[in-house]
């Protein structure tokens, strides 16, 4: 036995050694295998990284090259775009020039026609009046002869009676008594006749007053309506701004929220990826450990069984116990060996399991079957799913070795049976514990726990240790039982051990799964995602659905089938992933990362989608908030944690999705509900996992597909959103701009492309999933189809929108790839698509999100939200229209709206720039259009408004980031808009001009209609237009079209009216000229945009005011006593305060509201008022109607201000004064003037004395040369007259200047008077111009002064008489220079005023309107006298000078504002032709008013002359009768109204505290008188005459402004006046070049100077109107030529007047005068030039009026330049020339006054204008306005009176009127 035992022991030891060797070898081999596998994995990773890096580098290099290429292309395109833009601008400028030239030509033609009509009407009326007077004279002579014959007969009879002497006396007594009785009867009859005539005149006056009151009431109502509409507009604008701010705030909030969400999503994504990698590593390690442990345990069991079998055979039963006891050590050894191996594996796992494990692991883990049970083929088959995991090779390596060991030690059959049969018993056992113990919980949540392992290695450790302990215990038990068992039983025991170990493995996995549950894995999601797959596979395999998923999976057929089905599912899911990946790659290279994430996400979805959310939830659980704490909980707590995490994730995802994907919101909400139901049912799962599975199947099916679908979309969207937001957040503004800009173009293509691809991918995924799930779940498909439909419907709806946008965006989206920003934008495009236009623009996000949200989720909700948003964004809009509109329509329309908005915005901007310059109508139309468009835009869907904002942003960003196409498109849009503007304005201008002409005719015809009807109609039309514009806000497209139509209609109407008032395009009449076009187009575009706004506002306001003022002044004429009744002091302070405040207030209001309906209303009102004025003029030729709009308006304002008791008192006083003035117009004026002068002397004496003295001395000196005695006498007379006139007002001083004596003297010295007037006119204009020219360039003044000096020199050379004029002219030049300083100061003041609230603009406007009137009056009157007396030589000189002045003045356009007003007034006056008012109503109102005033002055001077001299009386008698007749009364009232208006306007213009005298330097101001007195001219009253309001006005105006602004300038002006030639260069506003240029065209005078001052605006308007005036001047010159022809001598007066203008623009008026002198054509040209000067001044020599005339054209070029230099002054001068020529001839005093008037007009001081008129016409007692009216009639029938005769003045007044018409 011992040998046997030893042998057996030896064998046993041998076997033990073999076993040890085997185990050692196995261990070494395994270690080597691990090392090799680790090395292999590292090599693989390195190789993969290298290749990937190489590819990435190559791709990056290629992309960089592509980007560089795209950038180069972009830059090239931008260069091309810029070139095209420049070309486009040049073309647009040329088109604008052509259009303006065309418009000017048409307007000039219309003005010429109107002028001709006006002259014809005036001549006809005058002829009728002359005929009536002649008839009356004949009747009187006949009656006188009869009486004489009768008396002679009686006388003859008496001596025949032979009675004795005693009886002789008694006989004689009866005869004497009878004779006395007869004489008494005759006298009484004459008295009765006179009383009847007076009563008739009073009745007519009352009727006129009633009509005026009606017109005033209509104007007030219209103003109230306008104010109300303006308030409404302001409120709407404020509301719109608030809404925009609110939208901006929301946009910012949206940006912040998106940034926060992006950061949160990025953090979650990173956490998710980290958790996924950790889970993958843990699961991989756990799986490998489990596989290794099970394989080792199986091998150990096999070896144990083999050893026990051998021991059982070799050992006796007694030893068996020992043997059995000895085996635990090996087992323990093995066990401990296993643990180190596991630990070692755990350490090796990180190397073996790269992060790539994340996606494949779930697939490998999908099957609960342990890896070692799977055949090697199965593992090999499974390995492909493990992308880069070297684990399967490692697990395969030990298995063959184990198999080899088994093959060596174990019988072949046993091994085969083990392999084949082991799985069944193993699974048999596994079924029981899993179903009984662990599976219920595991199956509750997900059904597939084996797939999920603990998150932490810590979770793996506990199961491993228990597992090992269990194995140890069971192995010990099995070993003990085996020791006592038979060898055959040992095999069964071995298999039992295998089963138990398998069961323990299952338990370990279950425990792992439980821990996963405890750790809060989203088992619900897992079930939802995994359950369907497994259940589908099980159902497809025919397995019972009630069996637990694990049981089914544990079964071998179920295992294999599950593996196959899972692989199929994963493959099907992968295929969509791949497909999706490929299109995504094709979509964008930037989305490569997003695609990878999508791959992972899709793979995760394919795993079960649940894993994705488990991971995210695990991530959140891993987060300190939930992780470790929740991991410790079990069962429901875990489920609750899972729920909370799920809900949080869902909420975060939902909120993110809702913001980013509103369309998905609905499906997500349903999914959430389903998930909640699933959660609730999952909670019930522990009860019956099978039932839960059944219940879950439909839910899972429904949830899985939508969840997969939505999760895939969410992942895609989130990733895209993250990337795009990151990119978009890089520069949200740039992104927004680009996204906005490229949204329609760039985004549409990528959006459509990406949407299509996304749709394709989604459909492929859905189809593939449906195919993979078809057989198992048709119900799921149905449910999912419903979800799909729900999801797809909004998606399709939105995708359709997106596609529409994408189609539009395709072009630029292609370019978007060119630049990284565009690529970012492209990334933003899918965001916008996926966010469904939520990111379309951060601005639109709110509205668009709401729209998309509401439309996708709830169309009703969308309606509500949209309505709210739209209500906020578009208060006027009907939200239902936009909200109810389909997104497709909105999207389709949105691009169209965007384009339209772009067109509209661009066209608006361009139209504003060009048309504002072009015409008030265009500007107003566009002003109406922009609000309409804006409101329309606001009415448009928020997308459209946002798009508009985007368009603005795009335009701005396009400057920096414009893609070539975008720029080209913009240029195209610009071109289209320009073309539209050019064509439309050209065609519309032609039509409008035609309409304007026809309208003017109709107006002249309809002018007889009541103003109320017209105003009501116009206001009704305005209201209709406003209402229509508001209504248009309601309809978007229709509204736009309507707006265009309406705007075109109002534009046409307004243009017609404006053409009548001041052709809007006359604003840039000089633009066509190449130099001035370039300079002035540029400057005028800038300046005119500004100035035109100011000037147009002022012009429109002044025109409105003037119309109102005219209406008021007509009321004033009715109650002209207001002005006259007021002491000059009262009037002046009233003017200063009331007029200033009123003028300033309306100017401010109107200036502030220039762009509003006010402009149209004002323009409409102006034409209406002008028509009413024309009606008045037609009715009575009342100078009232002729009154300048500014004066009228001012007078209206004054009347309104004073309307209370003052009006009544004034009316009474006016009546009394009117009667007195009719009786003694000159004396009354003189008295007033004296009063005013006395009152003003104290104030102004100090101010104006020095300058005035110097000027007076210079003027006297000059006149002394010409004819000091006459000048002195005239000066005295004028002084007296001026005193009265100044006391009466600026107009009265004119009359007084031209009082009978001064007129006689002036007639005697018409040259001197003209000269004096000229200096005044020049001085005033120059003062004004110098202010303007100061702004522009001092050169203008100096140029004009030089021109004036040259003109004066020329005049001196031409005539010695003219020398007197020249002296005045020189004086005027000096004054002009001095006034130019004054004017500059005035302009500076005006500029300051403009800078101020707009009072000064108003003042400037008032001054402009006032100045034109005064200049006309004084210039006309003076022009008549001075012109007549000065002679043609002087007129020629003036004509040349005037032409040069016009040319010189032509340069500066700033003055057109005045001229516009002047021209507007003149045009209005001229248009009515028969009624000067009618021309006055259009634009000529002021000019006519001026001219009429000069004419009135001339008439009044005639009237004064009747007082002063027989000729004056002769001429004046005719005129005075008219003046005193209907016209005189009307003129007086009108002139008083003008005085009031001028005073008011002047007061408004001037600070309340500043005496009018300071501003006006009017005789009213003491300084003026002192200056005038000190300056005493040779005429004796040189003070009045020398300072004669013209000189004073010139000097005074210059002085007051100067004193206020340049106190020293007044002195300088006087000194300068002495040395005007030198001083001209010294003038602050006039550089020497200007003076040098005086002879030449002073191109120096260009709008630049106007830019410098607010007055530039006013004068710019005048200049524009002046340009218009020039255009009109061409007509006027035609008419004026006719007028000038019969004005023949007028040119000299015109020369004098020209000097006035020239000194303001000396050459201008001289040129004008020269035009008149050179020939009748020239005189007409001179008239036109004067008018043109005015117009040119107003035009600022936009086009030299002279140029309109033959020589006046050339001269006007020079004079235009001079005017350009002297713009405003020249304008005034030109106005003065019109009237000034007459004045000059009739009396220089008025001319000086005209200058003052002009100066005042330029300074915005109509008072001076009024004074000039009064001075000229004081004799008649008719205000200049009245005189203007009278003159207008006289113009109608120009009387060729001797140069000394006032009729000449009247004629010159007529010419002035005709000129006014011409100017019109």
Curated annotation (Swiss-Prot):
Residues 8-314 form the IF rod domain. It comes from the Eukaryota. Residues 152-174 are annotated as: Linker 12. Constitutively phosphorylated. This increases during mitosis when the cytoplasmic intermediate filament network is reorganized. Residues 44-55 are annotated as: Linker 1. Residues 56-151 are annotated as: Coil 1B. The modification Phosphothreonine is found at residues 316, 389. The modification N-acetylmethionine is found at residue 1. Disruption phenotype: Embryonic lethality with the neuroepithelium of developing neural tube exhibiting low numbers of neural stem cells and high levels of apoptosis. No effect on cytoskeletal integrity. Residues 197-314 are annotated as: Coil 2B. Belongs to the intermediate filament family. This is Nestin. The gene is Nes.
